[in-house]
């Protein structure tokens, strides 16, 4: 009887290691299956969160589309035409302003043309004379500097002692005169702004379709 019990114990002992050998593998398989399902669930949840975030971002961008955006383009030209007596100047100005606020677009076009005022003609004539004088003075100064450059043929450069200060001051005076004429012309242009044609356009980008409005306004103004 005792021998039989020992034999059974040995048999149970010999079977236990096999069960122990199987249990880690089964636990490992269960763990891997749980890990895969867990991370798969996390990935699905993250994907759903990303989709919700992108959708909310698009909604926010649509709502924030109501912010105003404006742009302005201004072009002004002075031209002379062949066949006219004297140096008559023609002034053309074009200004376009556009403001976008959500689905609404407001556009303003300002255009003017015609003969430039006599003050502009006098100013531009003075500018042309100064430009010609600068060219003449500059050429004369450069020529005299090269003539007086003692070491020019040997060194290839000029020194400060080779510059005639009187001619240099004369050139600077002409440049100052030209700058003054440009400033005068700019002040006259700003002060004597002449608004002749102004068009306003207002439109809505929607399904109901609001009509656009245009009006001619702002009569001539002179300061």
UniProtKB/Swiss-Prot annotation:
Checking InterPro entries in the record gives: C10orf62 (IPR037649)
Which residues lie in Basic residues bias regions? 1-11, 202-223
Q: Which parts of the sequence carry Phosphoserine?
A: 43
Biased composition range(s): Low complexity: 62-73
Location of the region described as Disordered in the Swiss-Prot/TrEMBL record: 1-37, 49-73, 196-223
Which keywords has UniProt assigned to this entry? Phosphoprotein
Pfam (any one): DUF5569
| UniProt feature, compositional bias: Basic and acidic residues | 12-37
| Biased composition annotated in UniProt, kind: Polar residues | 51-61
- Coiled coil (UniProt feature): none
PANTHER family, A to Z: CHROMOSOME 10 OPEN READING FRAME 62, CHROMOSOME 28 C10ORF62 HOMOLOG
Tell me what this protein is called.
Uncharacterized protein C10orf62
């Amino acid at each position: 009887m005792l021998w039989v019990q020992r034999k059974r114990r040995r048999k149970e002992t010999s079977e236990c290691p096999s069960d122990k050998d199987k249990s880690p593998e089964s636990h490992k398989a269960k763990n891997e299956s749980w890990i895969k399902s867990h991370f798969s669930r996390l990935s699905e949840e993250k994907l759903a969160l990303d989709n919700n975030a992108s959708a909310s971002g698009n909604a926010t961008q649509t709502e924030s589309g109501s912010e105003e955006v404006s742009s302005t383009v201004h072009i002004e030209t002075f031209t002379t035409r062949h066949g006219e007596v004297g140096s008559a100047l023609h002034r053309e100005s074009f200004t376009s302003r556009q403001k976008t606020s959500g689905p609404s677009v407001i556009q303003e076009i300002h255009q003017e043309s015609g003969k430039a005022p006599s003050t502009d003609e006098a100013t531009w004539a003075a500018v042309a004379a100064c430009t010609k004088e600068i060219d003449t003075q500059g050429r004369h100064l450069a020529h005299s500097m090269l003539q007086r450059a003692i070491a020019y043929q040997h060194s290839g450069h000029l020194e400060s002692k080779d510059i005639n200060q009187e001619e240099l001051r004369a050139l600077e005076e002409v440049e100052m005169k030209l700058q003054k004429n440009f400033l005068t012309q700019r002040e006259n242009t700003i002060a004597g702004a002449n608004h002749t044609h102004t068009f306003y356009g207002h439109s809505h980008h929607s399904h109901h379709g609001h009509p656009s409005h245009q009006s001619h306004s702002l009569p001539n103004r002179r300061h």
